[in-house]
C-alpha cells in the first residue's frame, strides 16, 4: 500500500493505493523516521526496544520491495533523542540480514534561534535548506555520488520574521476552515 495521511491536501483526503514497486526502483531511499516517536519512548528502555524492533521490521519491508536500493536512515533536524535507537536498529538489521546497503546519518538539530520555526515548531525554510545541504554532503560522502548544485532560490535570505509572518498566514487560514 502507498500514501496514507491523517490530513488533507487541497481539500482531498488521500487514501491507501495498491502500488507496483517493480515499476520504479530508486537508487536511494532516505528514511527520516522517529521524531514523533520520542514522545512515546521518552527514554524508556522497553519502549525504545519496541521502537527498534519496529524499525528493523520496517527496513525489512523496504528491502523486500526495493531489493537493489541503498537505504539511508536519518534523524535529527527536530531532535536527536532516538538516533541511538536508529543506529542500534540498523546494526541489528544488518546483522540479521547481512545487508550492507543500509547506512545512517544524523542531521544537525535545527537552529531555531537564528532561523526561526515553521508551523508547530517544524523547521523553517532556511533550516530545510540547511538540512538539504547536509543530506547532499552525506550522500556524496557515503556513496561517492557526484553532487549536482542546487539552484539558488533565495531562501537563505529569508529571516526568522519572514517565517513568523508565514506562520500567521497559515494559522489564519486553518482557523477559517
Question: Predicted segment positions?
Answer:
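Conserved SGNH/GDSL esterase-like catalytic core that processes O-acyl groups on lipids
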Residues: 1-49, 77-84, 118, 122
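Surface-exposed acidic, glycine-flexible loop patches that form ligand/cofactor-binding
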Residues: 15-24, 60-65, 95, 142-145
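Well-ordered alpha-helical segments embedded in enzymatic catalytic cores
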Residues: 16, 54-58, 134
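Structural recognition of the beta-strand scaffold that forms the well-ordered cores
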Residues: 27-32, 70-75, 103-106
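Extracytoplasmic, non-cytosolic globular domains
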Residues: 50-69, 75, 89
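Short, well-ordered coil/turn elements that cap or connect secondary structure elements
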Residues: 66, 97-99, 161
Amino acid at each position: 500500500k502507498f500514501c496514507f495521511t491523517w490530513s488533507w491536501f487541497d481539500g482531498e483526503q488521500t487514501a491507501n493505493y495498491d502500488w507496483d514497486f517493480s515499476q520504479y526502483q530508486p537508487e536511494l531511499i532516505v528514511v527520516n523516521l522517529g521524531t514523533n516517536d520520542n514522545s512515546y519512548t521518552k527514554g524508556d528502555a522497553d519502549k525504545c526496544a519496541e521502537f527498534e524492533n519496529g524499525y528493523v521490521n520496517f527496513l525489512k519491508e523496504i528491502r523486500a520491495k526495493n531489493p537493489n536500493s541503498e537505504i539511508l536512515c536519518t534523524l535529527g533536524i527536530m531532535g536527536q533523542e532516538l538516533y541511538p535507537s536508529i543506529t542500534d536498529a540498523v546494526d541489528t538489521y544488518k546483522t540479521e540480514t547481512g545487508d550492507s546497503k543500509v547506512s545512517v546519518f544524523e542531521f544537525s538539530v535545527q537552529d531555531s534561534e537564528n532561523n526561526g520555526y515553521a508551523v508547530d515548531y517544524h523547521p523553517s525554510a532556511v533550516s530545510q535548506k540547511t538540512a538539504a545541504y547536509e543530506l547532499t554532503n552525506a550522500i556524496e560522502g557515503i556513496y561517492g555520488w557526484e553532487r549536482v548544485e542546487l539552484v539558488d532560490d533565495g531562501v537563505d535570505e529569508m529571516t526568522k520574521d519572514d517565517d513568523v509572518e508565514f506562520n500567521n498566514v497559515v494559522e489564519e487560514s486553518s482557523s477559517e476552515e
